[in-house]
């Protein structure tokens, strides 16, 4: 029995790029909705509040989470598209590396591109996804910083 990775070894470059696009966007969609679920009062109180102990997030906050949160938002939402869509081994490694390092940047103030997530850690009800496009679609985007002076970003 072949695996989804073995089935994808001979994909064309264009088809591989299409798969990368799908995997990233489906992962982001899963993450967005699992993250919104984690903000339902019961889930927030018993699961996600651990992650939000960092009002001023630092890189390690990306991994500082309850095990249920890790399974739903950080693992399940990222692995499922690989299993369903499949891709070659090298693309999978590259996406796994990117999926591991980008959340660390999202939790730092060093890169202006990732500032939207700082708003999430201040106000809790905005900016649930990566890149902001799903937040814009679903009405949860807030592009301003709640306390930009504190983060030295104004």
Predicted feature descriptions by range:
Residues 8-9, 41-154:
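Cytosolic/stromal cytosol-facing helical appendages immediately following the last transmembrane segment
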């Amino acid at each position: 029995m072949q695996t989804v990775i073995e089935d994808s070894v001979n994909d064309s470059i264009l088809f591989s790029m299409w798969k990368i696009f799908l995997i990233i966007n489906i992962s982001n969609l899963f993450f967005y909705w699992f993250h919104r679920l984690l903000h339902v009062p019961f889930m927030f109180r018993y699961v996600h509040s651990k992650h939000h102990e960092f009002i001023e997030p630092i890189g390690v906050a990306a991994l500082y989470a309850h095990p249920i949160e890790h399974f739903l938002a950080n693992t399940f939402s990222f692995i499922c598209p690989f299993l369903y869509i499949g891709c070659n081994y090298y693309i999978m490694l590259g996406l796994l590396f990117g999926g591991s390092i980008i959340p660390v940047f999202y939790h730092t103030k060093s890169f202006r591109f990732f500032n939207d997530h700082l708003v999430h850690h201040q106000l809790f009800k905005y900016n649930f996804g990566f890149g902001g496009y799903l937040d814009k679609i679903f009405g949860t985007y807030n592009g301003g910083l709640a306390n930009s002076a504190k983060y030295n970003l104004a």
